[in-house]
Structure formats: structure tokens, C-alpha cells
Design a protein with these regions (language model features):
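Surface-exposed molecular-recognition determinants
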Residues: 1-140
């Protein structure tokens, strides 16, 4: 049996950061040290009861969902605004970047957006997706 070696640090990074309250239009708060460009980031304040927030590259930056809420997806120009080569940049929204507040973030590396093979009878064609077969992680 062949074993596949997967480095979990290349696929998932938990990273605490401190908010600075800077609005995205003024540069925002660049959180670096992830080690890869994230495709999915989950953020939660570690110091207040703010809701959890998730942003992903398929839905698009500024599109946010709250997994611990019944609220629908919403758009925030002051939420997560950029997935960069080594992290992400957030604006001044309370759930992402209140000055001096501590946040926990979990960033996941997605994968490619091409190469989905079908058997010819597939009736669903996603408009956007990201999948990483070796990590067993997909965003559809």
C-alpha cells in the first residue's frame, strides 16, 4: 500500500492576531504568517461574544457567513477584504478587527479550480469551486 505524505501545516493554519481597528480604505489590518494563500478563513473574537465569521475565495472576499447564526450571507466592505500570499487583510468590522481585541483565525488552503471530471451524466455544474484532493477539502 502506498502512503501519501501530507504536511498539515501547508493546508491549515491556526493563527491568533490582535485587532487594530484600521478601516480597509486606510490599509486595514494585514494578518500574515499563514504560510500560504488561504481559500477559506474562519475568524472568532477570543475576547468578546462577537459571532463567528467565515469568508472564502469561492464566495468572494467581502462575502461573509456566520456559522453560529441563522443569518444569511452578507456583504461587508470592512470584513475580510484580501486573501494574500501569506495571509489576509481585514477592515474595521467588529467581528474582524476591533482595536486591541484578540482574534483566533483558522485558514485553510483550497486548491485548483479546474479538472473536475464527470461521467457525462452530471446535471449540476457549479459556477465556482475550489478543491484540494490531497487535503480532502472542497468549497462549492
Amino acid at each position: 500500500m502506498a502512503f501519501i505524505s501530507v504536511d498539515p501545516n501547508a493546508l491549515l493554519k491556526a493563527l491568533p492576531y490582535t485587532g487594530d481597528g484600521v478601516a480597509y480604505g486606510s490599509g486595514g489590518n494585514a494578518v500574515t504568517g499563514v504560510g500560504f494563500q488561504p481559500d477559506f478563513t474562519w475568524i472568532k473574537s477570543a475576547t468578546t461574544s462577537e459571532e463567528h465569521v467565515i469568508t472564502d475565495s469561492v464566495r468572494g472576499v467581502t462575502k461573509t457567513i456566520k456559522p453560529n447564526s441563522t443569518a444569511a450571507e452578507y456583504t461587508s466592505s470592512e470584513g475580510l477584504n484580501v486573501f494574500g500570499a501569506d495571509g489576509f487583510t481585514v477592515g474595521s468590522s467588529d467581528q474582524f478587527n476591533t482595536n486591541t481585541e484578540t482574534y483566533a483565525s483558522w485558514s485553510f488552503k483550497g486548491g485548483t479550480t479546474s479538472g473536475i471530471a464527470t461521467n457525462g451524466s452530471t446535471t449540476i455544474t457549479p459556477s465556482a469551486y475550489s478543491f484540494n484532493q490531497s487535503a480532502g477539502f472542497s468549497i462549492i
